């Protein structure tokens, strides 16, 4: 019998950081295409995005675990969106003190100090929905099997009533 254990917080942080970094690059590439019709799709971000996204999504994971039985999905997504704005403002403000903030929303109509902008409310909300329903929920299902040998196939899935058990 395999002894599978949940991923550590550091392992989950790593997955969240890489996911956020990738999404940031893809979003900036798509934005460049929509705004400037640039077929090169130049996606860019900063290495700071790894820390920012990894930490933020790990905190949202904690929120999800506490709120999932208490709040409807849309309310949770509003809470996550508000958290995203607070986190983006806070990290941006700190990085700006060192001339290291990689974003500037000053050109947007509804920006605050160039660090956050209301124009991103819908993308942040949609991102929060995807983050909870796909990224966090599936990351929490991942397991380390400490008895598995590297390179060997996993043990066959357990059968339930003659069917492969997927949960």
UniProtKB/Swiss-Prot annotation:
<keyword id="KW-0472">Membrane</keyword>
<protein>
    <recommendedName>
        <fullName>Transmembrane protein 229B</fullName>
    </recommendedName>
</protein>
<feature type="topological domain" description="Extracellular">
    <location>
        <begin position="95"/>
        <end position="109"/>
    </location>
</feature>
<feature type="topological domain" description="Cytoplasmic">
    <location>
        <begin position="1"/>
        <end position="14"/>
    </location>
</feature>
<feature type="topological domain" description="Extracellular">
    <location>
        <begin position="36"/>
        <end position="40"/>
    </location>
</feature>
<keyword id="KW-0812">Transmembrane</keyword>
<feature type="transmembrane region" description="Helical">
    <location>
        <begin position="110"/>
        <end position="130"/>
    </location>
</feature>
<dbReference type="GO" id="GO:0042116">
    <property type="term" value="P:macrophage activation"/>
</dbReference>
<feature type="topological domain" description="Cytoplasmic">
    <location>
        <begin position="62"/>
        <end position="73"/>
    </location>
</feature>
<comment type="similarity">
    <text>Belongs to the TMEM229 family.</text>
</comment>
<dbReference type="GO" id="GO:0009617">
    <property type="term" value="P:response to bacterium"/>
</dbReference>
<feature type="transmembrane region" description="Helical">
    <location>
        <begin position="15"/>
        <end position="35"/>
    </location>
</feature>
<keyword id="KW-1133">Transmembrane helix</keyword>
<feature type="topological domain" description="Cytoplasmic">
    <location>
        <begin position="131"/>
        <end position="167"/>
    </location>
</feature>
<dbReference type="InterPro" id="IPR010540">
    <property type="entry name" value="CmpB_TMEM229"/>
</dbReference>
<feature type="transmembrane region" description="Helical">
    <location>
        <begin position="41"/>
        <end position="61"/>
    </location>
</feature>
<dbReference type="GO" id="GO:0016020">
    <property type="term" value="C:membrane"/>
</dbReference>
<feature type="region of interest" description="Disordered">
    <location>
        <begin position="148"/>
        <end position="167"/>
    </location>
</feature>
<dbReference type="Pfam" id="PF06541">
    <property type="entry name" value="ABC_trans_CmpB"/>
</dbReference>
<feature type="transmembrane region" description="Helical">
    <location>
        <begin position="74"/>
        <end position="94"/>
    </location>
</feature>
